[in-house]
């Protein structure tokens, strides 16, 4: 029995320095966010990029940073399920739900089609399209966890997280003005904001800047998009296995049903049945947020800024096009439903 515990202790000892550094970066980012208003995810990423030397081979922190960027990330995604329940769907009505679901699916399909025009592969299309369509940085990290590894995996993930976070912040300021320009009601404004802005925090900020009804509706719509994370990640995983794309590219085939997806679905199911008390759900949400913040700090530390800048204008154009496509689609859908 003692022998079986030694590897676990060894893993903890090996991973702790890198995890501690990542947690410190995340805490610093949260402090700056609380005092200056910038998104914590963006700050954690930028601070992490400045500490890339800590992830170099041979450093004591490198193993823990790699562990945090992968395992802690998956824990954060799994715990998101505690915030999801089937009761959310009944509150919106079938028309709005159909619009939100269609927006997610069509944005991902648009990304796959548009990526060919800018010379980007299917991995990059799924990564950016899924992050724009679902829930920004959290979706990007979840999708990256099931995509086959390749030479530019970390660079593309950091670019995607950075881009969707910046675009979310811009949208938080711009989209409420567009909702007024389009003449949307408070409810429709909430559907528009929740259905188009990438990250949850910016959705909340944009929604409540208009009013309580808009803020509550926007948050609800956003959580419905978040609830699509597990099905979308599962579909990606199944498609990759079925087509043999991972083996063809020399990568490691992802599992049929990743453990963090099972965790997400299990928690969502328990919450839907009312088996998770509100206090526990709120606590799980906070743990999830911190796990993702620490993980994105680790991802930033692992990534070379110089290599990230090699991503090119085509990638920037693609993620902008995906963002515009989703906004136009939801706007058109609201006008048709209205």
UniProtKB/Swiss-Prot annotation:
Record membrane topology: Multi-pass membrane protein
The keyword Cell membrane appears for this protein: yes
Subcellular location(s) per record: Cell membrane
Transmembrane domains' residue ranges: 36-55, 75-92, 96-118, 125-147, 162-184, 223-245, 255-277, 290-309, 314-336
GO cellular component, one term: plasma membrane
Pfam families (alphabetical): Cons_hypoth698
Main location: membrane
Key word Cell membrane present: yes
Keywords: Cell membrane, Membrane, Transmembrane, Transmembrane helix
Disulphide bonds in the chain: none
Family: Belongs to the UPF0324 family.
Name of the featured protein: UPF0324 membrane protein TauZ
